[in-house]
């Protein structure tokens, strides 16, 4: 069996590693570097360049040099992040026919996985050159907060590159594997703070060692899929553009060539300011006007850079608090803090993290290589090369379906260990309902519309039955890659529908954070909404039952009683159209009072009929949840 290689497919740089005996080894590419810039260029003569060669020619070919593609993978064109990148990137971001964010290069439409595949091909070739044999299998890492669409798109990129992706694993988890495997760490709880080129993750991970077997269990994860070194670069670039404009009265944003030179200079200055207190951004002949050439020479201090990016660093602190809270731990429970990602070399980032956790982060983990090493370790586990290691990862957000009253009913809660499978039985909302719509949601809010829609499908051909009698079993199955499969089965007929959720629109981090923040800020509003839905459902049940009893009673019920009941029902139905819980409760009570005689008659009939009704009701399964489907008619 061939090697399963480990690939860290990064926003800014990528890295490949393999298991060499019991140790993971990071491989050098054809240029002799251990990391490869995630940059792809399409030249005028039809050549595709990847890595350092692509980076070197970027200044002369800015429109056809693509970088930070990971920020677009699995995203919709209308996503806020894609729109933001569209305005600042030198290359052209367009809407695909299905609404995804794609790119246009030399008049040709290209999907982000197609472009990322070029980087993966280079990683594959690097491993093949070292091993002297073909490589067909890989473990690829993704940010822990990547959603279904982004994970699926990453797998697609692997397939395009000629790799069978054996497992998608989360970057902080991979870093924990790299840290924990070769150290006699015993039982420890660690925090992995991963601030890379385009994404940010925090994971709280417990490492347990029992009889020589190490278990890496993720307790909680959080993050921001659109926060990273690229944003830090953008802040510095904007500052330099504004300073040059003040000094020379010219806006460099209109000159793609100048902006590409500026991008390189800003990235270099940012890196230098991690070790120096000040640096010069010196770009002669940056542009020209009628009076002649213009030169840029601007001094940038570390303090200035820190003031430009302070809010970005602070944005990474809030997810730390949420992750600890979700794990049920306090700062004092964390024994080690590991920094991953090139941006964590910035002293300000290190200080903020140290201040938050009350301890210095470890310096013995290489922030650029740890993730690829962890991916190689996981590859070794899958191929059997590495024994006595068990990895337990989690899903970052709750997953559920929409049930009657517009409620989100979770089937799998956030931070559940994966792979996992959960089934729940639901029923129909109307008599003789022949179809139900399974609307799959992701998020933390009670109201369905406040969560992210992942997709929906219909289960039709349901056997005609009174409301509440049909048994619809919904199963959520998350595989080890964190990809969701949903099925719905009519237990009476055995009819089943399945889908793999391939959300064409991915959840972005800001939406996720907003959901979590909203869930906390609106806990009271959610509680009231839940109570209102319960009151509505009880009233609805009462109307349905009363109407049925009226039909059965026929002429046996005095006319004045029948009129009073019908009036009370009308009043309750009118109240149900509003949002006033107290009003619905009052009208429900009024209907209960006037339908007393009807209830007596129904009880007498039941007594006369003996225990038959009891027998049929007993057949209903115990685990049926009191939440029902309404059929959603597809918009034509």
Curated annotation (Swiss-Prot):
InterPro entries: ATPase_NBD (IPR043129), Chaperone_DnaK (IPR012725), Heat_shock_70_CS (IPR018181), HSP70_C_sf (IPR029048), HSP70_peptide-bd_sf (IPR029047), Hsp_70_fam (IPR013126). The modification Phosphothreonine is found at residue 199. SUPFAM superfamilies: Actin-like ATPase domain, Heat shock protein 70kD (HSP70), C-terminal subdomain, Heat shock protein 70kD (HSP70), peptide-binding domain. Residues 603-636 are annotated as: Disordered. It comes from the Bacteria. Keywords: ATP-binding, Chaperone, Nucleotide-binding, Phosphoprotein, Stress response. The keyword Glycoprotein does not apply. The keyword Cell membrane does not apply. Acts as a chaperone. Belongs to the heat shock protein 70 family. This is Chaperone protein DnaK. The lineage of its organism: Bacteria, Pseudomonadati, Pseudomonadota, Gammaproteobacteria, Enterobacterales. The gene is dnaK.
């Amino acid at each position: 069996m061939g090697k399963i290689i480990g690939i860290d497919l990064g926003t800014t740089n990528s890295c490949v590693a393999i298991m060499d005996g019991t140790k993971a080894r990071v491989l050098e590419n054809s240029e002799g570097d251990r990391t490869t810039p995630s940059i792809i260029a399409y030249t005028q003569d039809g050549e595709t360049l990847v890595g350092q060669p692509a980076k070197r020619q970027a200044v002369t070919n800015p429109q056809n040099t693509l970088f930070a593609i990971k920020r677009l993978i699995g995203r919709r064109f209308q996503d806020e992040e894609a729109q933001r990148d569209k305005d600042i990137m030198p290359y052209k971001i367009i809407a695909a026919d299905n609404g995804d964010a794609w790119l246009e290069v030399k008049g040709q439409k290209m999907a982000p996985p197609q472009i990322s595949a070029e980087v993966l091909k280079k990683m594959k070739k690097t491993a093949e050159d070292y091993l002297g044999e073909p490589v067909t299998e890989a473990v690829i890492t993704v940010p822990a907060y990547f959603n279904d669409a982004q994970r699926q798109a990453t797998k697609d990129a692997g397939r395009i590159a000629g790799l069978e992706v054996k497992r998608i694993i989360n970057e902080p988890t991979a870093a924990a594997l790299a840290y924990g495997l070769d150290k006699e760490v015993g039982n420890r709880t660690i925090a992995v703070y991963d601030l890379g080129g385009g994404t940010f993750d925090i994971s709280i991970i417990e490492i347990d060692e029992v009889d020589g077997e190490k278990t890496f269990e993720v307790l909680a994860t959080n993050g921001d899929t659109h926060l990273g070194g690229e944003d830090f670069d953008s802040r510095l670039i904007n500052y330099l553009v504004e300073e040059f404009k003040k000094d020379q009265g010219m806006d460099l944003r209109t000159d793609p060539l100048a902006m590409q030179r500026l991008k390189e200079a800003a990235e270099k200055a940012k890196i230098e300011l991690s070790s120096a207190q000040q640096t010069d951004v010196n770009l002669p002949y940056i542009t020209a006007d009628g009076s002649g050439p213009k030169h840029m020479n601007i001094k940038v201090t570390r303090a200035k850079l820190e003031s430009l990016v302070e809010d970005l660093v602070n944005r990474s602190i809030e997810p730390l608090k949420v992750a600890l809270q979700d794990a049920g731990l306090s700062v004092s429970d964390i024994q080690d803090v590991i920094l991953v990602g090139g941006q964590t070399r910035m002293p300000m980032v290190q200080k903020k993290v140290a201040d938050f956790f009350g301890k210095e982060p470890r310096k013995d983990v290489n922030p650029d290589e740890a993730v690829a090493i962890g991916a190689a370790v996981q590859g070794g586990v899958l191929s059997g090369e590495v024994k006595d290691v068990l990895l337990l990862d989690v899903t970052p957000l709750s997953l559920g379906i929409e049930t009657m009253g517009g409620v989100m009913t979770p089937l799998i809660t956030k931070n559940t260990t994966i792979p996992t499978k959960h089934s729940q039985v639901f029923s129909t909302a109307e008599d003789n309902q022949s179809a139900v719509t399974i609307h799959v949601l992701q998020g933390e809010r009670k109201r369905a519309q406040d969560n992210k829609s992942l997709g929906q499908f219909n289960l039709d051909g349901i056997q005609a039955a009174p409301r509440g009698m049909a048994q619809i079993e919904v199963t959520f199955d998350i595989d080890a890659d964190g990809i969701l499969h949903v099925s719905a089965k009519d237990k009476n007929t055995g009819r089943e529908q399945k889908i793999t959720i391939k959300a064409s629109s991915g959840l972005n981090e800001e939406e996720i954070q907003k959901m979590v923040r909203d869930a906390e800020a609106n806990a009271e509003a959610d509680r009231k909404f839940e109570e209102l839905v319960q009151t509505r459902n009880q009233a609805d049940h009462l109307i349905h039952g009363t109407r049925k009893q009226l039909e059965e009673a026929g002429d046996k019920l005095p006319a004045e009683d029948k009129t009073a009941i019908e009036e009370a029902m009308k009043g309750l139905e009118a109240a149900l159209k509003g949002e006033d819980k107290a009003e619905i409760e009052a009208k429900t009570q009024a209907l209960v009072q006037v339908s007393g005689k009807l209830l007596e008659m129904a009880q007498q009939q039941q007594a006369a009929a003996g225990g038959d009704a009891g027998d049929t009701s007993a057949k209903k399964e115990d685990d049926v949840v009191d939440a029902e489907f309404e059929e959603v008619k597809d918009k034509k």
